[in-house]
């Protein structure tokens, strides 16, 4: 169960969808109505669905599963990076490279190269090179770090994807579907919930709203990891007793 309230979602503008002329009819069951030609998302459906997502990722994390956070649009980048790091999960916050999942063997070679360059820099080997060569390697390192730094330690394909804006990240969603990797997605009124295993109907353009979704998922992952740790401690020692207590943001640029 997440700690977010209906009031918090409202204050973050999570209920504001896109302009009515851009709507996707497949999202009709999640739409409460419209105001000033903006669709209003029914948060009474969003909140329990967000709870379903947090319960799901908590179970995954308890089983040491890897959940890849994906959010490359401006409204999502900072939250995706911050909260994925906080809960120890891989992330993509810059640009989704085609084949990042479906051609992972090739991507892994680039990750090896990234680690090699980082090790060279840490050992000060760049300082022993001529200026031009050191500059070229530095630029290569920066480029690889920007595109692959978040999945550097993923160690294989993820067990699930958590995506902010399934339309913007449609390539990532398509690759996951091809590999039968479950997809958790924030879906706004202009996109389709089809092929999304766990839907979070909500505003995907508000930074405050996006931060709430991502924070809730990260918190649930940490809870799952902690429950796994508690379970191991209690099973390892019969002497350990474990107790548990049970502003409106209008869309722009359309």
UniProtKB/Swiss-Prot annotation:
GO biological processes: translation
InterPro entries: Ribosomal_uS2, Ribosomal_uS2_bac/mit/plastid, Ribosomal_uS2_CS, Ribosomal_uS2_flav_dom_sf
CDD domains in UniProt: RPS2
Top-rank taxon: Bacteria
PROSITE patterns: RIBOSOMAL_S2_1, RIBOSOMAL_S2_2
Pfam families associated with the record: Ribosomal_S2
Keywords: Ribonucleoprotein, Ribosomal protein
GO molecular function terms noted in the UniProt entry: structural constituent of ribosome
Gene Ontology CC: cytosolic small ribosomal subunit
Stored NCBIfam families: rpsB_bact
Protein family according to the UniProt entry: Belongs to the universal ribosomal protein uS2 family.
Name of protein: Small ribosomal subunit protein uS2
Species of the source: Legionella pneumophila (strain Corby)
Lineage: Bacteria, Pseudomonadati, Pseudomonadota, Gammaproteobacteria, Legionellales
